[in-house]
Amino acid sequence: MYKDDLMVIALEEAKRAAIYDEVPVGCIITLNNEIISLGRNKCIEKNSPIRHAEIEAIESACSIINNYRLCDASIYVTLEPCHMCCMAIVNARIENLYFGAKEPKTGAVVSVDNFLDKKFLNHKVNYIGGYMERESSELLKDFFASKRKT
């Protein structure tokens, strides 16, 4: 599968989050070119501030492969991860991060911080942003615009 195809799947997860009135962020994890888990924001659904799409996908992937390390895995997320999610990605030893839209308020990869480039981290994550950035941004803008109307 191509990265754009994988981001389309992550966007579908983000749309699913919006159906549940969650901030529309979706995520998938691949290992050996196969999708092993999906995640979407579930903070409201689970009454927990930490149930971001990345956390959901990482926990699911770890459970599926029966290991807390996701070495050689790639994570695709529609929005630039926050600090908490970046640390989870590092701790899971995920190899590659691909994200869609930048997050100017809490994005810890390139927007408010370059967290994944910090020398104190014990694992290096390769990252590239901008995959289907327009589609990811529009989904978020539409979601928040609908919130302001109500």
Question: What kind of feature is each model-predicted range?
Answer:
Residues 10, 14-17, 27, 37, ...:
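Small-residue (primarily alanine) positions within well-ordered alpha-helices
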Residues 25-33:
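Short beta-strand scaffold segments in enzyme catalytic cores
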Residues 43, 77, 101:
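Residues that line or immediately flank small-molecule/substrate-binding pockets and catalytic motifs
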Residues 47-51, 55-88:
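Helix-adjacent hinge/juxtasegments
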Residues 36-43:
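Short beta->alpha transition motifs characteristic of CBS
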Residues 1-20, 68, 81-150:
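Zinc-dependent deaminase
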Residues 21-25, 71:
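Short, basic and Ser/Thr-rich N-terminal targeting/leader segments
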